[in-house]
Amino acid sequence: MSTNKKINLTEFLNQQYLCECLTVREIETLLEFTDEVTFAKGEIIADVGEVGEALYFVVSGEAALVHPEEGGGSLELAHANEGEMLGSMSFFDREPRSIRIVAVKANTKLLRLRRIMYQRLRIEHPFIAVNLLEDAIVSLDRLFRRVTQDVATYSKYLYGGKR
């Protein structure tokens, strides 16, 4: 990774919830454990049935969490924007993915933290790893709240007000 790119990523991460308790040096350390990957619009980042072997952080662009439907269509469940984490459920519980993660915009850039690097990070830099876990919890909480609100809205639409 070039020096300019590393500086830009450090500045970007320094503004994100994930790194709000980390020093610049700790952010630079985190970057040493990740690699940057780029996806084209519509490209699959992670697919249904795979066990998550990496965590992803959206640097630029956007990704969608979609559930493939029979017959080729798909139901979009949520979006992940800059600064958000992707792939934490399957990564931590090691169960096959139940949704597909797809790049929504061209040149969607993600930081990828592979499992083997996370295991090293956890041992060598536990404070950074704890911050990742907290961010995963917050990300899942946000997703759960969004989905819950959507279900409530659809339920009200389908069944009307109070029964």
How does the language model describe each region?
Residues 1-163:
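Cytosolic regulatory regions built on CNB/CRP/Popeye-like sensor folds
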